[in-house]
Amino acid sequence: MAQSLNKTVELHTTGVSYMAIGGKVGKFLIGDMALEFYPDVNVEQYIQIPWTSITQIGANVSGKRVSRHFEILTDKSKFLFASKDSGKILKIAREHLGNEKVVKLPTLIQTISARIKSLFAKKS
């Protein structure tokens, strides 16, 4: 049986985890100790990410609008999630992690232009 790491829950919302081919719909539990995701199909395939192991969390921002998708980087892996409440999740993460670990991810155009620039950059 799944055992939560959190003692108190600050936000409970629905979302999608993109860990394999196709997404898994489930519930987010964001609390005092960790960010947790429990799939609706099989709760035993849960994802628990303690705040201490997160190195960076970010989402795409255009204007003042935060995208539904957000990315979590840990010491060992990278997780991709989507939620209608991604802005609320990032605000709670900022309280636990600090401003330096919550970042604005580059847009698709910025990523493509950076790769093109790196192709034509002088190599010494």
Positions of PLM-derived features:
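Generic hydrophobic, helix-prone segments enriched in Leu/Val/Ile
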Residues: 9, 15-16, 37, 89, ...
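Short, surface-exposed secondary-structure junctions/capping segments
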Residues: 62-70, 95-111
